[in-house]
Amino acid sequence: MIKQLTNLRRIGRIKWLSVLLAIAGGLLFVGVSIIPAIAQTQGDLTIDFATTQPGVQSMSGFLYGVEQDEPPDHLIEPLQPRLWRTSRLNLYPRLTGFGATFQLLLSDTWGYGRPRGWPYDDYTRWENHVRNLAREHKGKKMLWDIWNEPDLRDPFWHGTRQQFFETYKRAYRVLREELGPDVIIGGPSITKYDKGFLTAFLNYCRDNNLEVNSLSWHELNDQTINAIAPHIRDANQSFRQNPAYRSLKIQRLDVNEIIGPTAQYRPAENLAYLYYTEQGGASAAAKACWEPKGGGPNNCFNKSLDGLVQPGPFAPRAVWWVYKAYSDGFSTRVRTQGNNPRVIGLASQSNGQNQAQVLFGYFEQGPSARQATVTLTLRNLQQLGLGQPGQPLNLTISRIPDSGEAVVKDLAIVKRQQITVTNQIVRLTVPNIRIHEAYILTIG
């Protein structure tokens, strides 16, 4: 089954990649003759260390990416994963041990056309499969994700939309019967935020007395990253908070695959996905996995943690450092405001080492300058209680390079500075930030 999943996910990702590239190529073709090259851009980030952001949910999460012992724990624990989407039930103890919510990808336990056929070929057989799994794993606390990308005909769904709805209904009723009223069941885990599909799905569920406790979809278009937050807010308003759908008992909005193929190794783009998904108010997210640049097994199945680490020697790549810094700071998030949607930042009162932190970067979205100058305005540093009164604070900026699959064992420090805080505002200008790169400012 795993070999089949590897091949199917490769086919599915290639086909989905071709769609994304066609969209991006069309945009570039239209823009070639009318948009001049942009050499430099400017972005301002204002951080108020006195204004906390309570209730922030971490978007650190993964799709497959590991085996029983690899990658080693010391490369996973610092990332503090909150969601793990997989069909590998034998990994349940390890993944939940990291603090992650286990999301069972039910369709991967069944297969896509072979060897069992499709659920609509024999609904009774599908129900029996779901029932057997539910009984075998009744004691495990997990989210049940019924089917993967039913809007992508090849390879994940060959039936009609109505047949998918029926497939969900059959699985839902079995799970509710076997596991009771508290088990979290969800979907439809479609390839993008398609409001028409979601509306039709939820209307069907409402009309058939079904629940959708976890409403899920994927965000994989690297050219529309900043649309993610509006999508989540729209889903919250249109569905989760809409009295018309109260009977569905929607508890969660899970973007259970984020980050497309072009962005998979780019630090700033990874940060942008985390930023906009968090800002939208999603319950959780999981990093998607794609083909390595040189070919070989999909990053879902080569023990690379979805591409964050090098397989084999198990050493971190640049994007691993983005996830680490993101996870270091999410529990003490403070307000950050910016004036350029491509220049994004997430700030925290503490990174766990008694240092305030700002994680920021400059990512590509349409025609973009190759570099940016970023001005950081730091407010209310005195309220952090760092150091002794009257003593200087140490500011350190480290660069997370756009280095693809290369190993990055340590981050290069690009600036060190001591400041004495004499008022409530400190301004710091960071010039020549390269597109796709991210930076970490620590204050302590």
Residue map of PLM features:
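Carbohydrate-binding surface patches
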Residues: N340-L393, S398-D402
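Substrate-binding cleft and catalytic face of glycoside hydrolase catalytic domains
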Residues: F62, P81-D222
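N-terminal secretory signal peptides that target proteins for export/translocation
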Residues: M1-R13
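Boundary/entry segment of secreted carbohydrate-active catalytic domains
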Residues: Q40-L89
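Aromatic/acidic polysaccharide-binding cleft in carbohydrate-active enzymes
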Residues: P261-A356, Y362, A369
